[in-house]
């Protein structure tokens, strides 16, 4: 496949998709949902092939978990499609309406970004989420999944593309890239691809950023922190940590490090350790922590910036909220971090000074998700401060354009003083 030629064709199809009515795009999503349910046994069979190959190749259990596409995952993605259909159209929203002068009206209106290339990791359900979000927001998308789920991705893409075209969307609204060398070709398509969204390891995301002039949106990893303040409620703290660590370990919003105020450590840590061990979690910690509970000691000099994606949790003691903030900003990934406290003033300080896309008080980091935010789904979680930040849903996949409606006005009249602007918001 010639990626350059294909993306040029997608660029031509992009305005056609952007101009389709929301009803038509919603119809496509409904057709996709129907197709996934109708062909679920074929999808599961393809996924079993991928899982068998993964085990033959000694892929880590945490990764195998991410590769799985079963009845539960199908239920999740179809629920996300239903939610997405119910959301308002992100295209055509007027965010500014201003009369510059009599008969000269300026509006700012949301519009699709255009052609988006998404290179994602092992999770096959990501293909459904990404393609459906792009279609709803009127964006053409190029999808490159991991080689670990080749069979699953292939059938999912085939069903999604066929359903979208059947519903009346342009043939070139979706493209699947399967070969690894096509990634480098895609990075060079700066004249036809408007945005790249990489999802994967830190090294992979950095590679993408360093080898393209196309704008890149995304995050590298998820080293999420929870800080247990001295004014904590134990009835909240332990369930929050257990949920953040164990509810689904193989995601970027799972908690990896817990910081504990020294004043409560002797009382709190043994209770936390019992709960963690019961949940099957291996505890790593500083030498100071090891004097209070049994842990795997983290050697001095080893970085605290570590994404385990497994039933492993690091614990460190801190003097208070300011040290917790400093540690989180230094060793976290600016993804999602939480303070567990009943002191609202302390919480405000933490939530103001921690430089992350999501900052929570007394809530699990696992809430950092497009579906749980009511976005329908997400194409990923951005730790960038430009354009979109946090879970990127429909709003993060649109830009805007300015429309100026006039009646023959010329700038010369305003430059000479013959006419004057009166700038009135409507």
What is each model feature region?
Residues 37, 41, 181-199, 203-207, ...:
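Aldehyde/semialdehyde dehydrogenase
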Residues 70, 101, 105-106, 174-193:
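A structured beta-alpha segment of the ubiquitous adenosine-cofactor-binding alpha/beta core
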Residues 121-125, 129-140, 155, 159-162, ...:
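ALDH superfamily catalytic-core signature
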Residues 27, 326, 330-426:
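C-terminal core of ALDH-fold dehydrogenases
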Residues 1-106, 133:
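N-terminal Rossmann-like NAD(P)+-binding subdomain of aldehyde/semialdehyde dehydrogenases
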Residues 97-139, 146-156:
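Substrate-binding/gating loop at the entrance of the active-site cleft, primarily
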Residues 97-98, 106-112, 135, 166-170, ...:
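Solvent-exposed alpha-helices and their adjacent loops that cap or buttress functional pockets
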